[in-house]
Swiss-Prot record:
Protein keywords: ATP-binding, Cell cycle, Cell division, Cell shape, Cell wall biogenesis/degradation, Cytoplasm, Ligase, Nucleotide-binding, Peptidoglycan synthesis
GO MF entries: ATP binding; UDP-N-acetylmuramoylalanine-D-glutamate ligase activity
Gene from which the chain derives: murD
Catalytic reactions of this protein: UDP-N-acetyl-alpha-D-muramoyl-L-alanine + D-glutamate + ATP = UDP-N-acetyl-alpha-D-muramoyl-L-alanyl-D-glutamate + ADP + phosphate + H(+)
Name listed for the protein in its UniProt record: UDP-N-acetylmuramoylalanine--D-glutamate ligase
Organism, as annotated: Blochmanniella pennsylvanica (strain BPEN)
Family statement: Belongs to the MurCDEF family.
Cellular-component GO terms for this entry: cytoplasm
Function: Cell wall formation. Catalyzes the addition of glutamate to the nucleotide precursor UDP-N-acetylmuramoyl-L-alanine (UMA).
Enzyme Commission numbers on file: 6.3.2.9
Length: 440
């Protein structure tokens, strides 16, 4: 544990993470200063009067006179004043780093471009049913610092690349990278390579690394670790894998057939792969296999992830609002069983992503494309023969409702962030769900 008394602490960002950092330091007798570039950040009403706040821009004087700067996830570390602060020897960290300096229980750390929330929830349910007192937090809306001082036996953390960028002391008993694909390119000027390096940081000093055998970007390459376990579809390259046997797909662990996938509530490739990684992590901490398999069979999925939310007159409406990057959208489409036309809704803030890999879907499926939001116009250039540009998602849905016929599928899988028009991907998904259920 660190003693921060006497430190000149400046916190950047006053969302849920920033507020948790403020409380962390106040509990330790340190009064931090807070900066937020927004004029009215969401946590401003919860800040005690003793804490000075500077809103609307960075305060260079505060930052360059600090001894410790704590940044919220998503704050650009290449901002000139932060670069200058580093040159002056000022430490810049995030909430995960603060947490790891204090935590005394073992940590399972999970990251990836897609699927990390699902795997985090699976492993946490397995541990709880097995009798562990588990703290779950990170990039899932629960600030990790809120878990301190609660006598947990195990921490399971979902960690984003943004959080990993400012984490140095993580020593997980098991660290997993589920997959790596292009995302947040607006945040990483070095492109996919820089984003990949950020993800790799989770392996540093991990006891066991868990990697995706089908994704070479998840292979631990430059950090020390004790042991590596792999998961994937191919038995030739993975410790945990899928195998087709006697008419069924099975989950196999070290050549042992452990679960017929037909017993799982969600029967698709995405869920099977998530199950492999979750089982690998649960085995590492010796959760009884019977408990883990029970959870895998009962799991019905998380909201806004390829979720069938309405079916009427033979038309299925699917909410995949969590698909905030291209790879997630491709996975969603490839897992559909199409008998009619696919009405695909794309749009939002693409974060400087390359959408060109969606083009091959044109040849494989009958797709009508509806584009909206900040990058809607760009998405219309993908080469789809049937494409409509609208200002909003709701406008697109109303047009779709006039065109659909039996056996069609309406899929919201935007391949983009929601923040250009919505508070969150959850809000985008809820609005999609509400309007879909109004159509008759």
């Amino acid at each position: 544990m660190r003693n921060y008394r006497g430190s000149k602490v400046v916190i950047i960002g006053l969302g849920i993470t920033g507020l948790s950092c403020v409380n962390f330091f106040l509990d330790r007798g340190v009064i931090p200063k807070v900066i937020d570039t927004r004029i009215y950040p969401p946590g401003i009403k919860k800040i005690p009067h003793v804490v000075q706040c500077y809103l609307g821009a960075f305060n260079d004087i505060w930052l360059l006179s600090a001894t410790l700067i704590v940044v919220s996830p998503g704050v650009r570390l290449d901002h000139p004043v932060l670069i200058e602060a580093l040159k002056l020897g000022i430490e810049i960290i995030g909430d995960i780093e603060l947490f790891t300096r204090e935590a005394t229980a073992p940590i399972i750390a999970i990251t990836g471009s897609n699927g990390k929330s699902t795997v985090t929830q699976l492993v946490s349910r397995m541990a709880r049913i097995a009798g562990w007192h588990v703290g779950v937090a990170g990039n899932i809306g629960v600030p990790v610092l809120s878990l301190l001082n609660k006598s947990y036996q195990l921490y399971i953390l979902e960690i984003s690349s943004f959080q990993l960028d400012t984490t140095y002391s993580l020593r997980a008993i098991a660290a997993a990278i589920l997959n790596v694909s292009e995302d947040h390119m607006d945040h990483y000027p070095g492109g996919l390579k820089q984003y990949w390096f950020s993800k790799q940081r989770i392996y540093k000093n991990a006891k066991i690394c868990v990697m995706n055998a089908l994704d070479f970007l998840t292979i631990p390459i430059y950090h020390e670790y004790d042991y590596c376990i792999s998961f994937g579809e191919n038995e030739d390259s993975a410790d945990y894998y899928l195998k087709y046997y006697k008419g069924h797909t099975w989950i196999v662990a070290y050549n042992e057939y452990v679960l017929n996938c037909s017993e799982m509530r969600i029967n698709n490739r995405i869920n099977y792969i998530n199950a492999l990684s979750a089982l690998a992590l649960s085995d590492i901490i010796k959760i009884p296999r019977s408990v883990s398999l029970k959870v895998l069979c009962q799991f019905s999925g998380l909201a806004h992830r390829c979720q069938l939310i309405y079916k009427n007159h033979g038309v299925s409406w699917i909410n995949d609002s969590k698909a905030t990057n291209v790879s997630a959208t491709k996975e969603a489409i490839n897992n559909l069983k199409l008998c009619g036309t696919l009405h695909l809704i794309l749009g939002g803030d693409g974060k400087l992503a390359d959408f060109s890999s969606l083009k091959h879907l044109i040849k494989q499926h009958e797709i009508h494309l509806y584009c909206f939001g900040k990058d809607g116009l760009l998405l219309t250039t993908l080469g789809f023969s049937d494409v409509i540009l609208t200002n909003t998602m709701i406008q697109a849905m109303r047009i779709i409702n006039r065109r659909i016929k039996a056996k069609d599928i309406v899929l919201l899988s935007p391949a983009c962030s929601s923040l250009d028009q919505f508070k969150s991907f959850e809000m985008r998904g809820l609005i999609f769900t509400c309007f879909a259920r109004e159509f008759r």
